[in-house]
Curated annotation (Swiss-Prot):
SMART domains: C2
InterPro entries given in the database record: C2_dom, C2_domain_sf, C2B_MCTP_PRT_plant, C2C_MCTP_PRT_plant, C2D_MCTP_PRT_plant, MCTP_C, QUIRKY-like
Organism the protein comes from: Arabidopsis thaliana (Mouse-ear cress)
CDD domains the UniProt entry points to: C2B_MCTP_PRT_plant, C2C_MCTP_PRT_plant, C2D_MCTP_PRT_plant
Protein name according to UniProt: FT-interacting protein 1
Upregulation: Up-regulated by APL/FE. Not regulated by photoperiod, circadian rhythm under long days, vernalization or gibberellin treatment.
Length: 794
């Protein structure tokens, strides 16, 4: 029974094929045809990776000549659009008889049961019931159909009618009503009947939006030297260092080794800056008075926009900058710019445009272009993604005592982020939104995450209790694994690791197509570096890259959270894997078994050769002898045979090639085998928030694991040192024996043809077990007795 449950769960974690009805399907006469304005000669739609969803659009533009209220002599008008049980309202204007709203309402046609569309104009009353001004009624059967790229439907003026529709009243309203799809330009900013329960500021947070990451630059500051820097105590020469701050980033040079008023450093400090350059460049030269006290001797403040932009590896001219004496300006007010001190600093500062500023891991990078746009190459393809729907999403919060989920998707590729609209209170939402990206390198990854919206302005309470959008799951797709011009439609499992273990949160359905614009250019890219050339001409250290990536992620998260509606910090951090560098016992085990899997082929080959040598299958061993004789007699066939063999293996494996993109694999991730304590440790904060006993237990476990790794590394070092000891005379007798052996071997190899040597060595290696001894060989015994530096270890 347990085996069946395990097999079932493994099946749930796999990718599933789908066959959705993609493309346009219209209710009146087939695809792209029928009556009305839709002609059969129209070009193919760009929305061919999603299922068609029909909406009734009502655009309320403005009204004129509205009658005032007979009691207040004023008019505070608003418009209410009613279709069946669905109602949408515009905002009201105070004391306006000619208001302008220019608002669009979108009603899902699948949920519309009414045969009429009613547009009411009402007068807002603060105490009593809102006053009726008039209405306009449209017959659903007479509503025209509009499909992009048709021009927008022109709104028209309609006279208001009384309640019964028998007579006209004073006032007119300008309205346009049409039947369209999610491809309509009005769709993203329209009021949706699906989100009619959302009010106030929450309305903005449910709409679909496209975001662009800020343009990031590396700011390189080469601190060369300073002159005439004086501390407050002039009797003691300063031990100076430089501190530079850009935004929230602070870096320091090393202390000048000599105590002098003319210190030298020649040290590089690298920061991340984003356009538009809002932060100031703030530099101070400080004196290390005591280990706990620093004294500012001078400062420099400058906007980032004044620095030179470098696009290649050419040298940047250095400049001398005057330092302002710190503290004098604060005392003298406006005279601070006049009080220049004689000290100055020598800097070489530039904004690096030839690098790609990495805000994500290189393992699943989505953008490889340099910062400077003039260095970009032409795109080699187009990536189109249809975000169709989701199924079986787990409830993420409680609202009014009811478990519910308000899901939306976020997709990130390159500098472009997209966010779908939020589907209110649905565990099986249907988005059917399509997005497009330009592709500059096929060896990149698109990331898509599903979240629960907790910012709808209601009484939601997430399971964690915090007002953050909860993670439902994530999908990554590497573009190089996709066949060109093929549509992949699959249902991807949404898997999340929690402290209690692995949990499937549902499934998300995607349609993906990668279109190649230039096959020759794409093949050409496979032989070129992934990153721009500056990363290889002037590379950063590993520690620098980690720090700069974290700073870039922080800047991107801060900028996108200021958009309207905001793409929140928790979204950006989850998509960019901000915690991927944190220690995890589970990841360590997974990486170890990945290494084992990589060498599994070599291990299997070694085992097979051992079976051949020990004559486990005599026929195989005899055939191997024959092949060995042929290769010895005709050595020029060795390399052609090897490459021909790999060619045939590639052709054979073509039949079994993967038919679908890779997805989150629970076995590779070692997700199901992780213990609860290991998962609890993985999700612990940094620094830890656990109790002393728990930390002690985990520390001891880590020491045990590290001890085993230490033993393996020591054994590898020992074997290498024994090779070095062969000629080092550390063991004089062993080295003497080896030197004599080398001399004899040189003479034998000189007078004996190589084919004879190779044939004799091969026959000895494959000799029959009758001629083998169970004792270790003499060379092995000799090697094991060589000395190593393990004897010198404390």
């Amino acid at each position: 029974m347990a085996a069946k449950d395990g097999a079932k769960s493994q099946e749930d974690y796999k990718l599933k094929d789908m066959k959705p009805e993609l493309g346009e399907r219209w209710p009146h006469g087939g695809q792209r045809g029928g009556t009305g304005w839709i002609g059969s000669e129209r070009a193919a739609s760009t929305y061919d990776l999603v299922e068609q969803m029909f909406y009734l659009y009502v655009r309320v533009v403005k009204a004129k000549d509205l009658p005032p209220n007979p009691v207040t002599s004023n008019c505070d008008p608003y418009v209410e659009v009613k279709i069946g049980n669905y109602k949408g309202k515009t905002k009201h204007f105070e004391k306006r008889t000619n208001p302008e709203w220019n608002q669009v309402f979108a009603f899902s046609k699948d949920k519309v049961q009414s045969s009429t569309v009613e547009v009411f104009v009402r007068d807002k009353e603060m105490v009593t019931r809102d006053e009726y001004i008039g209405k306009v009624v449209f017959d659903m059967r007479e509503v025209p159909t509009r499909v992009p790229p048709d021009s927008p439907l022109a709104p028209q003026w309609y006279r208001l009618e009384d309640r019964r529709g028998e007579s006209k009243k004073r006032g007119e309203v300008m309205v346009a009503v049409w039947l369209g799809t999610q491809a309509d330009e009005a769709f993203p900013d329209a009021w949706h009947s699906d989100a009619s329960s959302v009010q106030g500021e929450g309305v903005q947070s449910v709409r679909s939006k496209v975001y662009v990451s800020p343009k990031l630059w590396y700011l390189r500051v080469n601190v060369i030297e300073a002159q005439d820097v004086e501390p407050s105590d002039r009797s003691q020469p300063p031990q100076a260092f430089v501190k530079v701050q850009v935004g929230n980033q602070i870096l320091k040079t090393k202390l000048c080794p000599n105590k002098t008023t003319n210190p030298m450093w020649n040290e590089d400090l690298v920061f991340v800056a984003a356009e538009p350059f809002e932060e100031q460049f703030f530099l101070t030269v400080e004196n290390k008075v005591t280990p706990a006290k620093d004294e500012v001797m001078g400062r420099l403040i400058s906007p980032l926009s004044v620095f030179e932009k470098r696009l290649d590896h050419r040298a940047v001219h250095s400049k001398w900058y005057n330092l302002e004496k710190f503290g004098f300006g604060a005392l003298e007010g406006d005279k601070r710019h006049e009080l220049k001190f004689s000290s100055r600093i020598h800097l070489r500062v530039c904004l690096e445009g030839g690098y790609h500023v990495m805000d994500e891991s290189t393992l699943y990078i989505s953008d490889v272009k340099p910062t400077a746009r003039q260095l970009w190459k032409s795109p080699i393809g187009i990536l189109e993604v249809g975000i169709l729907s989701a199924q079986g999403l787990s409830p993420m919060k409680t609202k009014d005592g009811k478990a519910t989920t308000d899901p939306y998707c976020v997709a990130k590729y390159g500098q472009k982020w997209v966010r779908t609209r939020t589907i209110i209170d649905s565990s099986s939402p249907k988005w059917n939104e399509q997005y497009t990206w330009e592709v500059y390198d096929p060896c990149t990854v698109i990331t898509l995450g599903v979240f629960d919206n907790c910012h709808l302005g209601g009484s939601e309470k997430s399971n964690s209790g915090a007002k953050v959008d909860s993670r439902i799951g994530k999908v990554r797709i590497r573009l190089s694994t996709l066949e060109a011009d093929r549509i992949y439609t699959h249902s991807y499992p949404l898997l999340v690791l929690q402290t209690k273990g692995l949990k499937k949160m549902g499934e998300v359905q995607l349609a993906v197509r990668f279109t190649c614009l230039s096959l020759a250019h794409m093949i050409y890219l496979y032989g070129h570096p992934l990153l721009p050339k500056m990363h290889y001409l002037h590379p950063f250290t590993v520690n620098q890259l980690d720090s700069l990536r974290y700073q870039a992620m922080s800047i991107v998260a801060a900028r996108l959270s200021r958009a309207e509606p905001p793409l929140r910090k928790e979204n950006v951090e989850y998509m960019l894997d901000v915690d991927s560098h944190m220690w995890s016992m589970r990841r360590s085990k997974a990486n170890f078994f990945r290494i084992v899997s990589v060498f599994a082929g070599l291990i299997a080959m070694s085992k097979w050769l051992g079976d051949v040598c020990y004559w486990k299958n005599p026929l195989t061993t005899i055939l191997f002898h024959v092949l060995f004789f042929i290769l010895i007699c005709y050595p020029e066939l060795i390399l052609p045979t090897t490459f021909l063999y790999m060619f045939l293996i590639g052709l054979w494996n073509f039949r079994f090639r993967p038919r679908h993109p890779a997805h989150m694999d629970t076995k590779v991730s070692w997700a199901e085998a992780a213990s609860p304590d290991e998962l609890d440790e993985e999700f612990d904060t940094f620094p830890t928030s656990k109790g002393q006993d728990v930390v002690k237990m985990r520390y001891d476990r880590l020491r045990s694991v590290a001890g085993r790794i230490q033993m393996v590394v020591g054994d590898i070092a020992t074997q290498g040192e024994r090779f070095q000891a062969l000629l080092s005379w550390r063991d004089p007798r062993a080295t003497c024996l080896f030197v004599i052996f080398c001399l004899v071997a040189a003479m034998i190899l000189y007078v004996t043809p190589f084919k004879i040597i190779a044939l004799a060595g091969g026959m000895f290696w494959m000799r029959h077990p009758k001629f083998r001894s169970k004792m270790p060989s003499a060379p092995s015994n000799f090697f094991r007795k060589l000395p190593s530096k393990a004897d010198c270890m404390l």
